[in-house]
Regions:
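Transmembrane beta-barrel strands of outer-membrane/channel proteins
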Residues: 73-79, 272-278
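Periplasmic alpha-helical coiled-coil/stalk elements that build and connect Gram-negative outer-membrane
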Residues: 2-5, 129-242, 333-340
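Amphipathic alpha-helical coiled-coil segments
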Residues: 50-65, 129, 133-158, 163-166, ...
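Bacterial Sec-pathway N-terminal export signals of envelope proteins
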Residues: 27-77, 92, 101-102, 110, ...
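Membrane-embedded beta-strand positions in outer-membrane beta-barrel channels/transporters
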Residues: 95-97, 141, 271, 288-290, ...
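Acidic, low-complexity, intrinsically disordered peripheral segments
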Residues: 3-6, 389-422
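A glycine-/polar-enriched beta->alpha junction
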Residues: 39-49, 56-71, 85-88, 96-113, ...
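Bacterial N-terminal signal peptides
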Residues: 13-24
C-alpha cells in the first residue's frame, strides 16, 4: 500500500473530527467556509458503513486465502465378499489412511498476495469516492455562493429600476414625459421584482442542496467576499491526485498478483497417502505409502495465464495514460483559471466603472431633458449585464477550481481514515 495511505490516517481523522466538533459551536458566529462544508459532508457520508464492511470482507478473504488444504482421512474395505475363495469375510482387508495434497508453485502465497491487494483497493477506492464527494460539495458550495450573489445583483437591479421609476414619475407629473414612460418604468420595476423573487428561490434551493450533503437545513451564512478572491489563478496547481494514481497502481499490482497465481496453477499438486492395512485372513497388519500427481497433458492453464498477462499489460497502460491524461486536464484547467480570473478582474477594473459612469451621466442628462427614458434603460442594462458577466466569470472560475481540486486531491487531508483493517 502507498505510504501516504497509512502516514496520514490518524492526522486526517483528527482534522475531520475537529472540524465536525467545532462546527456546531461556530455555526452562529462564522460564515460557512469550504473546509467546514467538506468536513461536515465527510462525517455524514452514508457510504462509510459499507466501506467498513468491505474492508472486513477483504481482510477475511486474505485470511482465508492463506490457509492450507485440509487433509483427508479415509477407510477402505476390500475383499469383503465375492465368489469362490472371496465368498467369506475371512479374506477381507481394511485400510485406514491419511491423505494430504500439497500446494506447489507458490499457490498459497500467490492467493494471499492477490487477496491482500483487495484490501488496498477497498481503502484507495474509498478515498477516491470521498474526493468525488468533496467535488460535489464544493460545486454545491460554489452554486450557493453564486446564487447569493445573484440575489444581490437582482436587488441592485430592483434598486436601480425603482430609482429610475421615481425620476420618471416626477417628469410625468410635470408633463415632461408621456404617460407610457411611467408605465414602462413600472414594468421595469415589476420585472426586477420577479427576478429578485426567482433569485431568492434559487438561492434557497442552492443552500438546501449544499446542506443536504450533511442532512442540514440550510441555516448557515456564506461570506460574499470569498467569491471575489481569484488568487488561486496565481498558484501552481500541483500534480495529479495521489489517491487516483494509487488506485491505478494497486490495480496493476493486483493484475501482477493474478499473473503469479495463474502461473502457480500450472504447477501440478501431488497428493501423498499413508495408512495401515489389516489383513483379516492372517490377522496381520501392513503399512501403506503412496502418492499421485496429475499429468499436465491437456490443461496447463495457458489460456488463463495469457489472459492475466494481457490484463496486467492493460493495467500498466492505464497507470501511465491515467497520469498523462490527468496532467493534461490540470494544465487546461490551470489555464482556464487564469483566463477566468483575468476576465473578472478586467470587467471590474475597466467595464464596471465606465458602465456606472455612463448610468450616472445618462441619468443626469435625463433629468435635464437631454436623454430619453430608453437611454436610461439601455445604460442600466449595460451595467447589469456587465455585473452579470463578471459573476458568470467568477462562477466559471470557481467551478474550474473545484474540478482542479478534485484532480490534484487538494482536500485529501480531510478524508476520514478507516481503522477497520490495519
Amino acid at each position: 500500500m502507498p505510504h501516504f495511505v497509512h502516514g496520514r490516517a490518524t492526522r486526517s481523522w483528527l482534522l475531520a473530527s475537529a472540524f465536525a466538533v467545532a462546527l456546531p459551536l461556530a455555526a452562529q458566529a462564522e460564515p460557512l467556509g469550504l473546509p467546514q462544508a467538506l468536513a461536515r459532508a465527510a462525517q455524514s457520508d452514508p457510504t462509510r458503513p459499507a466501506v467498513e464492511a468491505r474492508l472486513k470482507a477483504a481482510d477475511a478473504g486474505a485470511r482465508q486465502a492463506s490457509v492450507r488444504q485440509n487433509p483427508v482421512v479415509g477407510v477402505e474395505l476390500e475383499d469383503l465378499t465375492g465368489t469362490g475363495p472371496y465368498s467369506m469375510i475371512d479374506r477381507a482387508q481394511a485400510t485406514v489412511y491419511y491423505q494430504q495434497s500439497l500446494d506447489r508453485g507458490g499457490k498459497r502465497q500467490a492467493r494471499t498476495a492477490l487477496a491482500r491487494t483487495e484490501i488496498d483497493l477497498v481503502r484507495l477506492r474509498y478515498q477516491v469516492q470521498v474526493l468525488d464527494l468533496f467535488q460535489a460539495v464544493e460545486l454545491a458550495w460554489v452554486e450557493a455562493l453564486v446564487a447569493e450573489a445573484q440575489v444581490r445583483l437582482a436587488r441592485t437591479r430592483l434598486d436601480i429600476a425603482q430609482r429610475a421609476q421615481g425620476e420618471v414619475d416626477r417628469r410625468v407629473k410635470v408633463a415632461r414625459d408621456p404617460l407610457f414612460a411611467g408605465a414602462r418604468a413600472d414594468t421595469q420595476v415589476a420585472e426586477a421584482r420577479i427576478a429578485l423573487s426567482q433569485a431568492q428561490m434559487a438561492a434557497d434551493t442552492a443552500r438546501r442542496n449544499l446542506a443536504s450533503h450533511w442532512d442540514g437545513d440550510g441555516d448557515f451564512d456564506l461570506d460574499p467576499a470569498v467569491l471575489d478572491d481569484t488568487a488561486a489563478a496565481e498558484q501552481v496547481a500541483g500534480e495529479a491526485s495521489e489517491a487516483d494514481l494509487a488506485v491505478l497502481d494497486a490495480e496493476r499490482q493486483a493484475a501482477t498478483a493474478r499473473v503469479r497465481l495463474e502461473q502457480s496453477k500450472a504447477v501440478q499438486d501431488p497428493t501423498w497417502r499413508a495408512g495401515l492395512r489389516y489383513l483379516n485372513e492372517g490377522r496381520d497388519m501392513a503399512v501403506l505409502v503412496g502418492g499421485s500427481i496429475p499429468l499436465a497433458r491437456h490443461d496447463t492453464n495457458r489460456g488463463a495465464i495469457e489472459r492475466a498477462q494481457a490484463e496486467r499489460t492493460a493495467a500498466d497502460v492505464d497507470l501511465l495514460s491515467g497520469k498523462v491524461l490527468r496532467e493534461r486536464k490540470i494544465a487546461r484547467l490551470q489555464a482556464g483559471l487564469a483566463a477566468r480570473a483575468s476576465e473578472a478582474r478586467r470587467i471590474e477594473a475597466e467595464v464596471l466603472p465606465a458602465a456606472e459612469r455612463t448610468v450616472a451621466l445618462v441619468r443626469e442628462g435625463f433629468n435635464r431633458g437631454g436623454f430619453s427614458y430608453l437611454d436610461v434603460i439601455e445604460a442600466q442594462k449595460v451595467l447589469i449585464d456587465a455585473r452579470s458577466r463578471r459573476l458568470d466569470a467568477l462562477k466559471a472560475f470557481y467551478t474550474d477550481r473545484a474540478l482542479l481540486a478534485r484532480l490534484t486531491g487538494r482536500h485529501a487531508a480531510l478524508i476520514p481514515a478507516s481503522e477497520t483493517v490495519r
